[in-house]
Amino acid sequence: AANLKRAHNIDPANVEKIEIGVRDTLLKMCNIQEPVTGLEGKFSMRFTAAMALLGENTGLIANYNEDKVQEAEIVNLRDRINVVNNQDMGKAEAAMSISMKDGSVHQIRTDVETPDSDLDRQWSRLSAKFLDMAGPVIGDAKAARVVELVAGLENAADLNEVTALCKG
């Protein structure tokens, strides 16, 4: 969703409807239609797609809470999203079709197992997600140091400092 938004400068207010096609296994796992809790939001493709199109960080744990899943702008867009079974998809693939109010249609097919073509962007996203998840467990300073060490891993003699930091 975020890639389509960037590529076509999509304004969510001009979206008529969105269809997401995935294999039935993902429908069983990540298809909570109207999440009520933050945890349910994490398992709702409709909710996370709406967040992404609205520019929200879907990798940030703090964005999955009861207030966010009830946020009017997100709910309004979420309710225009339909997730359907598409057995032509691979196990980690999704196809998205965004129909705009002006009649134009934007489509993308992605595989979440495929690395981002922009490795710097991928590193930034993964680092931010790690800091968000590890910070509360081992402390922000230690988490930041782990990211720093992993960034220079090819020059490391061993992993002793990384493992020590991760122990908390």
Could you say what each language-model-derived stretch is?
Residues 1-168:
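Terminal-appendage/accessory-domain detector
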